[in-house]
């Protein structure tokens, strides 16, 4: 029995108790929850439902809790139910009922934990979206890991997710990039406002391989040649780095396309129809202050050129016209001002501001031997995705970036994350999976098969803890998806791995020597099979491998 199953059972029991006593059963909340008590001796699960309901139905919380506890003790699968404190209900499950989660996991396999929580939602998830002027820096790498994990997580809950990369190939930074390439190709110093690093020299050489006569072209053609070929080469490198990191995108949208084909003009025309566009001082303004922004925004400048927000408006409208009802933007720490701006833009189009969600990621610092690592050997300036992967590998890089809330700055200790020790969180979790895989191989050599027919024998306290943690997985995924917090999956996996290691140290799974196999052995094998499955499912969500051997 999972916590969700118990919550539904508690709700049904409460409805029957209220109806029996002539009280208003409609006062029941739509969703009833149960929690694991902080002190295990208090029971397997606890609920404050009586305290939530008492005032609404005109009774005392402890009295209502007593009625519910009495009714629960008559329900199959409930071993005991007791009232505690001001009206808590502490519940213990019968072993057989608690152990049913093993069967649920084995039957569901890779889909255990999935739900239809977000069924019908069409989600556009835009992340990374780095300028094609250099390799992915370490901050963008965090979004590459977290964004991909969030996409996988939302998919498990029934959402139709499209991962999108907004390709910033419009604006002055692309001109500076082209000028930097030209300078490198000519053997000249990097322009004062240009880009430096060995990657610039490498790309300049590749441009000349593709266009050997480029340096003899007139200035305008020269810049356009280095701009077009250089951007394509840089973006190919970015996509390859992301692919090797385990992050791929469904759609790549060019910012330049927002400024061609009339998309910006179309967006402004739509906004004029809503009355939210006006002219002042020779410029065109969007009335975003009416929708929560701190000031109105210039859309078309007085010189007739579009402001940066013009592309954002066209891009948002493009997403909505493609049918997305939720647009999630994952932006860097310097983009806090975009939250109100993008929500106001949605409202100006007549949409619910909740159509837009903006996640802001904080800084990432790399540490080696207690000292910050600041310089990239490849880029010559900032640290990159490739630097991190070279230092600790893809799995550790992804896990280290995902396991903390995105609104928290993180320090990645390169020595810790590359170590084969229990202090390394990804090693700790992966080792649990490898240990379980080895156990399955050893069982197969003994011709032992996991058996779910005697799960009532799993009555050791370490078995009970492991069973309860397995049952938490669906709710962890629902909560993580609802809050857009994939780090919760990492923390859950660490808890599960710890519970498994403690179980393994206390409960012998396989017979030893001449010992004959028993029903307890095969029941424990089933518990191990379920644990292995849940660890694999969780690692798949965060895009980390589940090794069979370590």
Curated annotation (Swiss-Prot):
What InterPro entries does its record include? Answer: aa-tRNA-synth_I_CS (IPR001412), Arg-tRNA-ligase (IPR001278), Arg-tRNA-synth_N (IPR005148), Arg-tRNA-synth_N_sf (IPR036695), ArgRS_core (IPR035684), DALR_anticod-bd (IPR008909), Rossmann-like_a/b/a_fold (IPR014729), tRNAsynth_Ia_anticodon-bd (IPR009080)
Where in or outside the cell it occurs: the entry states: Cytoplasm
Q: Which stretches are annotated as coiled coil?
A: none
Motif 'HIGH' region, residue numbers: 130-140
First-level EC class: ligase
Which family would the database say this protein is a member of? Belongs to the class-I aminoacyl-tRNA synthetase family.
Query: What PANTHER family does its record include?
Result: ARGININE--TRNA LIGASE, CYTOPLASMIC (PTHR11956:SF5), ARGINYL-TRNA SYNTHETASE (PTHR11956)
Q: What is this protein called?
A: Arginine--tRNA ligase
Protein species of origin: Mycobacterium tuberculosis (strain ATCC 25618 / H37Rv)
At the highest ranks, the source species' classification is: Bacteria, Bacillati, Actinomycetota, Actinomycetes, Mycobacteriales
Q: Which gene encodes it?
A: argS
């Amino acid at each position: 029995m999972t916590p969700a199953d118990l919550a539904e059972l508690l709700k049904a029991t409460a409805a029957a108790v209220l109806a029996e006593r002539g009280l208003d059963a409609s006062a029941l909340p739509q969703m009833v929850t149960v929690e694991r008590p902080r002190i295990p001796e208090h029971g397997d699960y606890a609920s404050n439902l009586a305290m939530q309901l008492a005032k609404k139905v005109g009774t005392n919380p402890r009295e209502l809790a007593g009625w519910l506890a009495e009714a629960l003790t008559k329900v199959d699968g409930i071993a005991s139910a007791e009232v505690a404190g001001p009206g808590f209900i502490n519940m213990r499950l019968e072993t057989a009922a608690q152990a049913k989660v093993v069967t649920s996991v084995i039957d569901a396999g890779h889909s255990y934990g999935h739900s239809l929580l977000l069924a019908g939602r069409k989600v556009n998830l835009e992340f990374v979206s780095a300028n094609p002027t250099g390799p992915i820096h370490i901050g963008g790498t965090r979004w590459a890991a977290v964004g991909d994990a969030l996409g996988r997580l939302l998919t498990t809950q029934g959402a139709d997710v499209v991962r999108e990369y907004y390709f910033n190939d419009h604006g002055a930074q692309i001109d500076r990039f082209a000028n930097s390439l030209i300078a490198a190709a000519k053997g000249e110093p990097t322009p004062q406002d240009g880009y430096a690093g060995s990657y610039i020299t490498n790309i300049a050489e590749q441009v000349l391989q593709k266009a050997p006569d480029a340096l003899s072209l007139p200035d305008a053609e020269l810049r356009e040649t280095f701009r077009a070929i250089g951007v394509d080469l840089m973006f190919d490198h970015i996509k390859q780095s992301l692919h090797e990191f385990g992050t791929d995108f469904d759609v790549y949208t060019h910012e330049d396309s927002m400024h061609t084909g009339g998309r910006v003009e179309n967006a402004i025309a739509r906004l004029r129809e809503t009355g939210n566009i006006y002219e002042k001082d020779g410029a065109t303004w969007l009335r975003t202050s009416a929708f929560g922004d701190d000031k109105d925004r210039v859309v078309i400048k007085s010189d007739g050129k579009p402001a940066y927000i013009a592309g954002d408006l066209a891009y948002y409208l493009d997403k909505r016209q493609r049918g997305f009802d939720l647009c999630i933007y994952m932006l860097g720490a310097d983009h806090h001002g975009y939250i109100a701006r993008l929500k106001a833009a949605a409202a100006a189009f007549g949409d619910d501001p909740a159509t837009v969600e903006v996640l802001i990621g904080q800084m990432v610092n790399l540490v080696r031997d207690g000292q910050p690592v600041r310089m990239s050997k490849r880029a010559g300036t900032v640290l990159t995705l490739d630097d991190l992967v070279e230092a600790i590998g893809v799995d550790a890089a992804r896990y280290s970036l995902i396991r903390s809330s995105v609104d928290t700055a993180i320090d990645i200790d390169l020595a810790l994350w590359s170590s084969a020790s229990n202090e390394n969180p990804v090693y700790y979790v992966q080792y649990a999976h490898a240990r379980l895989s080895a156990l399955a191989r050893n069982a197969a050599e003994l011709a032992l098969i996991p058996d779910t027919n005697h799960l009532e024998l799993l009555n050791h306290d370490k078995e009970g803890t492991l069973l309860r943690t397995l049952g938490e997985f669906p709710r962890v995924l629902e909560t993580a998806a609802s809050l857009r917090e994939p780090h919760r999956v990492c923390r859950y996996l660490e808890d599960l791995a710890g519970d498994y290691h403690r179980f393994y140290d206390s409960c012998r799974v396989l017979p030893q020597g001449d010992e004959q196999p028993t029903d307890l052995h095969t029941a424990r094998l089933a518990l191990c099979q379920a644990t292995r499955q849940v660890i694999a499912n969780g690692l798949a969500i965060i895009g980390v491998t589940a090794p069979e051997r370590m």
